[in-house]
Design a protein with these regions (language model features):
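Generic beta-strand/beta-sheet core signal
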Residues: 7, 76, 195-197, 232-234, ...
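Hydrophobic, well-ordered secondary-structure elements that form the walls
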Residues: 259, 300, 320, 328, ...
Length: 441
């Protein structure tokens, strides 16, 4: 039996596709081993979101070949789409598989081991409207399942290469999504997270059928066994009164919304080619707070974007504090060859990016603590996931619908028996900076 090892780089969509490829290999008779072990096949699902991501992808490919020079090293994913010519010349890489062709992994390996000259499976995504059918019937995480429902992006933000490496928007058939979710529910999963490259574009290619993102959500809400539905990153403009009102009527929806912002300065947003203003973004947050009680609103922020002045940054900081997020993912701007932002003048020095990041991370810590504190004394239900030791005492941790982490005392109970079960109680004091104690009823 041949051994295969896989390594994922990048986003949740990539992670989903890596698990799907792993299951394809298992079904074909491969033994899946750790990437640290010697294997006959190494598959690296690459990322190309920044120049640094490109470098990491190359490093992992060479690391795999160094582990076993006789192994077949497969480069898959976004870096393949961005740099296929370079990979064809790289002696560490044997096979290359682009996005929308990952289902070809096993046939490509079969051809390799049969001595055939086929070395790649790549398509030009610019003109492709085909959604690649990849399925998962089990996941590495045993309580929360990520479901890819959409691929591609039509937004063309000035700093982003993804529309070129992932192609235009392509949606997964709703009945196909339903089938996978039903299988996962039968496997015992109680929570799903819908994910995609530009999630809220779901259904724009199904307009003639009257199918949109909300349609999909409502259909999944009807599936027995699934108790919670979360979303990946959402486009702020999807948050309308109608959308929020409809969601608020669905009890399985988690009031946890990640609205990608990137900057709190209108001038910077314009240079980024984001399609909203700060005022419009703030209005969307208020709509969510109108229809959901104390929802968790999280976001992404890029600091040090080309031409961002000290005044621009201060405008962003003030805006973030005003909106008051639960969590913020703060990224120093990282150049990506092939994007408009990479060619922009007035690139910000790395030292300035680092300083600005530190300011926002300090603000994030403050706001996050304040949001968690707002739940103290409230009755909550958490889905238990894993044990943790705090001050020599063992607890079982889980999350509320808002993704606030809490823990119960085990008191001698078997953590395996508690995993993936719900427990209710009153949230109390902090056990750590990020974990509240849940006093069971």
């Amino acid at each position: 039996m041949r051994k295969a090892a896989l390594h994922n780089l990048g986003c949740k969509v990539n992670a989903y596709e890596t698990e799907a490829m792993e299951q394809l290999l298992e079904a074909a008779g491969y033994e899946i081993v750790s990437f640290e072990e010697k294997a006959d096949v190494y598959v690296i699902n690459t990322c190309s979101v920044t120049n640094v991501a490109d470098k990491k992808s190359r490093q992992m490919l060479h690391r795999a070949k160094a582990k076993n020079p006789d192994a077949v090293v497969v480069a898959a994913g976004c870096y393949v789409q961005a740099a296929a010519d370079k990979l064809r010349e790289d002696a560490a890489v044997d096979l290359i598989i682009g996005n929308n062709r990952k289902a070809d992994l096993v046939p490509l390996l079969d051809a390799w081991f049969a001595g055939k000259e086929i070395r790649e499976s790549i398509t030009d995504l610019a003109g492709s409207n085909e959604y690649e059918k990849l399925h998962i019937n089990k996941q590495a995480e045993h309580t929360r399942a990520f479901i890819k429902v959409q691929d591609g992006c039509n937004q063309f933000c000035s700093y982003c290469i993804i529309p070129y490496t992932r192609g235009r928007v392509r949606s997964r058939r709703p009945e196909d999504v339903e089938e996978e979710v039903k299988i996962l529910a039968e496997e015992g999963y109680k929570e799903i997270v819908l994910t995609g490259i530009h999630l809220t574009s779901y259904g724009i290619d199904f307009k003639d059928e009257g199918i949109d993102f909300l349609t999909l959500i409502k259909r999944l809400h009807e599936i027995d066994g699934i108790e919670r539905i979360r979303f990946g990153s959402l486009e702020p403009r999807v948050i309308t009164e109608e959308f929020a009102s409809e969601l608020s009527r669905l009890p399985k929806i988690c009031p946890h919304f990640h609205l990608s912002l990137q900057s709190g300065c209108d001038d910077t947003l314009k240079r980024m080619n984001r399609h909203y203003t700060c005022e419009e973004y703030a209005d969307r947050c208020e709509i969510l707070r109108k229809h959901f009680r104390n929802p968790a609103i999280t976001t992404d922020v890029i600091v040090g974007f080309p031409a961002e002045t000290d005044a621009d940054f201060e405008t962003t900081r003030e805006f973030l504090e005003k909106v008051h997020f639960y969590e913020m993912h703060v990224f120093p701007y990282s150049r990506r060859a092939g994007t408009r932002a990479d060619r922009m003048p007035d690139q910000v020095p790395e030292t300035v990016k680092k300083e600005r990041s530190a300011v926002l991370l300090k603000l994030e810590k403050k706001m996050s603590g304040e949001y968690r504190s707002s739940f103290a004394g409230t009755e909550q239900e958490i889905l238990l996931e894993e044990p943790v030791t705090i001050n020599d005492e063992v607890y079982m941790t889980g999350y509320t619908k808002e993704y606030v982490k809490a823990a119960i005392r085990l008191d001698g109970r078997d953590p395996k028996a508690l995993k993936n079960t719900f427990v209710s109680g009153i949230l109390g004091d902090f056990l750590t900076e990020e974990i509240l104690i849940l006093n069971e009823k």
